[in-house]
Amino acid sequence: MNYFLKAPILGFEHINEVRLEKIDSLFSRLISQTNSPMALDMVLVNPYCLREYSFVIPKYIELLLELDSHSKVEVYCVVVLQKNLEDSMVNFLAPLVFNSKNGFGAQVALSMMDYPDFGFRDPLKSFVIQERERA
């Protein structure tokens, strides 16, 4: 599905339209749809499949995305891929929030002070190992 970014992705402020493609229940891909010499193509992960994950969406983001009780909200975190997938890093401090009801999206920058259990370079393997131990 295509989304219009109402608040930019950090480092990609020139991109305002993206396509979100699901790879599987855990991973998705975000691809820029804006004509630009600096294209965006990143892997995202569903944070709720990895860990306990909860944060407050700031009021200004709620307003920008026109969120209400009927909105279908999807949240993803950016994955920095490494050669070995389990060595990849997840940024839990800058989630991407999408309202699939109206096609709006935004990135939220969370404070480490408010969310000390979230990191911006958490290794994917630590969550994969935890999941294996639970099974």
Swiss-Prot record:
Where does it reside?
A: Cytoplasm
Signal peptide: which range, if any?
A: none
Disulfide feature: none
Q: Which UniProt keywords apply?
A: Bacterial flagellum biogenesis, Chaperone, Cytoplasm, Translation regulation
Q: Which domain of life is it from?
A: Bacteria
Q: Which GO terms are recorded in the biological process aspect for this UniProt protein?
A: bacterial-type flagellum assembly; regulation of translation
Cellular component (GO) terms are:
cytoplasm
What is this protein for, i.e. what is its function? Answer: Acts as an anti-CsrA protein, binds CsrA and prevents it from repressing translation of its target genes, one of which is flagellin. Binds to flagellin and participates in the assembly of the flagellum.
| Protein family according to the UniProt entry | Belongs to the FliW family.
Its quaternary structure?
Interacts with translational regulator CsrA and flagellin(s).
Q: What is this protein called?
A: Flagellar assembly factor FliW
Q: What's the encoding gene here?
A: fliW
